[in-house]
Amino acid sequence: MNKWGVGLTFLLAATSVMAKDIQLLNVSYDPTRELYEQYNKAFSAHWKQQTGDNVVIRQSHGGSGKQATSVINGIEADVVTLALAYDVDAIAERGRIDKEWIKRLPDNSAPYTSTIVFLVRKGNPKQIHDWNDLIKPGVSVITPNPKSSGGAR
């Protein structure tokens, strides 16, 4: 083996020793399961390209409040992505994350927002187009149960 082959062998050996295997746990709420399955794959590939490290992201999903309670009670979450700031605040109040978490990243540390939509009957017979239309006589509003839906709060 020539000196280039020996050098390349040492370089490859050093690179494999320096690369890390990283495991993370993202504790999140139910509707984000599919989103994070895709996002985690993309992030892992990006991180590998940038650092050489292998990242495996495990997921735990459930109701936002239940997931907050799991973290408060000791589940070792590396990332928390919950439906409500209230649930993240509860974790911070118990000292599991920094109380100033909301100031850590742009947009109050919210990586995305939910879009509000109005679902109307076919043809929109009551001509509902904006928030003010919801208080017209004869218009009824149906919302999710705030006891079971993070989006309803």
List where the protein language model places each region:
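Short, compositionally biased segments
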Residues: 150-153
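Basic/polar N-terminal segments that are highly enriched at the extreme N-terminus
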Residues: 1, 18-19
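Extended rod-forming repeat segments used as scaffolds/tethers
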Residues: 9-10, 37
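Short, linear, compositionally biased motifs with a strong N-terminal bias
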Residues: 10-11, 86
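N-terminal signal peptide c-region/cleavage motif recognized by signal peptidases
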Residues: 14-16
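Bacterial N-terminal signal peptides that target proteins for export
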Residues: 1-8
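N-terminal segment of the mature folded domain
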Residues: 20-148
